[in-house]
Regions:
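Short hydrophobic transmembrane-like helices used for membrane targeting/insertion
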Residues: 1, 14, 19, 44-47
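Intrinsically disordered, low-complexity cationic segments
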Residues: 1-5, 12, 51, 267
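A subset of signal/propeptide-processing and intrinsically disordered low-complexity segments
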Residues: 4-11, 46-47, 64
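Bacterial N-terminal signal peptides that target proteins for export
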Residues: 7, 11-12, 18-39
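N-terminal targeting/docking segments
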Residues: 12-13, 173
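Bacterial N-terminal signal peptides
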Residues: 36-48
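Feature marking well-ordered beta-strand scaffolds used for ligand recognition
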Residues: 50-449
Length: 449
């Protein structure tokens, strides 16, 4: 998910901008709250996910932002929600193909007249030669959240992070806790024939790839590089040798507090491999924070009480009780059933057993109560022409020196207690400012107040 926000639903949105700008920070070079702790560049702009500069109803065009927030009172809906935009005009809204309906989209990349739309079920390729009538060229079914996509020449790179993604793109998932069938990392496709992508190879990583960023090195035209940001738990070393979830103090080879750098030989992309794992988060303290707003605490408590009354499952995380969704609970209930040698629907005893085990399960997923700085980035934006990158890394915004592309180094870091989750970063054209966005509540549970 990037600074240019796309609908989280399964349709292709084509928008026309009234104020076109040439952005040097593309996907190859990635396209007001409390004051930050320290500036990264000449000026650092912090923009929250609920910025009030959006304006005017969808379909109308205005050069100046209106004073009233037009989002107030918009109707809800999955595909027919009310819309508000400023200096953007919606040209088309094309439903997803059948295998991608109701599944979350992630990112867009471009190849000639085509838009490649990442989706948790794989990717779709749209011919947008006429943006008013996009034409689906292919829907490539290959599940693995979140399928962040990037293109370099004839190569398509796709992120995989979910535990159910398979190296063979199968849809049956991976039921085993340790399996060589699981894909968590980067998939590489040859899209010379856009209607028939060829799956060339994959590069497995310890934490998978939530997002990735392509980086070209002016000094190395024979290769392209990929910065991988993985935010999932560390996989078992029995599944991928060398993976360790211990802290760097306990294990210098820890998969935490680092990114992965993949080198892709353009003549032989199937030989792509990790060449470094820079610890760009080393020695960062826990960012400042404050508690949830009273209305959020009350709302969470009410939802949890109602869920418990219905027989639902809840968990306490950092002092607040949350309702656990069925997509989280159902696989664990199935495991309880299989663990006792049973089959079919879970029984009341199975539910009781899971409730007893949940506190330990959640504790392992969330980690200890000891707060640290970030252990990964959500996204990295690069500007190779000036040798800099911006990292939106959960609790911090980072400025990186990428003059040595394979070995990025941290130049500075800022934090802000009024930022919930540093989500994306974008440079201005002359590289003197870096814009960060905040993902408040998470992509699936957005908040705006």
């Amino acid at each position: 998910m990037r600074p240019l926000q796309r609908s989280p639903y399964s349709s292709a949105h084509i928008l026309d901008s009234l104020m076109p700008t040439a952005f040097p920070t593309s996907r190859l070079a990635r396209s007001s709250r409390a004051c930050c702790a320290a500036p990264l560049l000449a000026g650092v702009l912090l923009v929250g996910g609920c910025s009030h500069s959006t304006s005017s109803a969808a379909g109308s065009m205005a050069m100046a932002a209106p004073k009233a927030d037009p989002r107030v009172g918009l109707r809800a809906g999955e595909t027919d929600a009310g819309e508000a935009a400023w200096n953007l005009r919606l040209l088309s809204n094309t439903p997803a193909s059948e295998k991608f309906k109701g599944v979350t989209n992630s990112d867009l990349s471009f190849f000639g007249p085509y838009a490649i739309q990442g989706n948790y079920n794989g990717f779709q390729v749209w011919d947008i030669s006429n943006p008013r009538t996009p034409e689906l060229k292919i829907g490539y079914l290959c599940p693995a959240s979140q399928s962040d996509v990037s293109v370099y020449r004839n190569l398509l790179f796709v992120s995989g992070e979910g535990f159910g993604g398979r190296v063979d793109c199968g849809t049956q998932g991976v039921p085993d806790t340790v399996s060589t069938d699981r894909l968590r990392g980067i998939r590489i496709f040859d899209i010379t024939d856009i209607t028939n992508p060829k799956y060339l190879a994959n590069v497995q990583t310890c934490r998978g790839s939530h997002t990735h960023t392509l980086v070209s090195d002016p000094k190395d035209p024979d290769n392209v590089y990929i910065y991988v940001s993985g935010s999932a738990p560390v996989r078992s070393p029995n599944e991928l040798a060398g993976c360790s979830g211990l802290t760097p103090e306990e294990d210098p080879n820890s998969a935490l507090f680092r990114i992965e750098v993949i080198k892709v030989p353009l003549a032989h992309p199937e030989q792509a491999a990790i060449v470094s794992s820079p610890r760009i988060f080393y020695d960062l303290a826990a960012p400042p924070s404050h508690g949830e707003a009273p209305q959020d605490v009350a709302r969470a408590a009410k939802a949890a009480a109602e869920a418990r009354a219905r027989g639902g499952f809840t968990a306490t995380i950092h002092g607040m009780e949350f309702v656990l969704p069925s997509r989280f609970v159902d696989p664990m209930l199935d495991s309880v059933v299989k663990g006792r040698g049973g089959s079919g629907a879970p029984t009341a005893d199975d539910s009781t057993a899971l409730r007893a085990a949940l506190p330990d399960i959640i504790a392992k997923l969330v980690g200890s109560n000891i707060r640290t700085g970030p252990t990964q980035c959500h996204d990295i934006t690069v500007y190779p022409a000036i040798g800099l990158a911006g990292g939106a890394c959960g609790g911090y915004g980072l400025l990186l020196d990428i003059s040595d592309v394979a070995n990025p180094k941290r130049l500075g870091a800022v934090s802000d207690s009024n930022f919930s989750f540093w989500h994306s970063a974008t440079f201005n054209n002359d590289g003197t400012k870096l814009l960060f966005t905040d993902e408040w509540g998470g992509g699936g549970q957005p908040r705006c107040r």
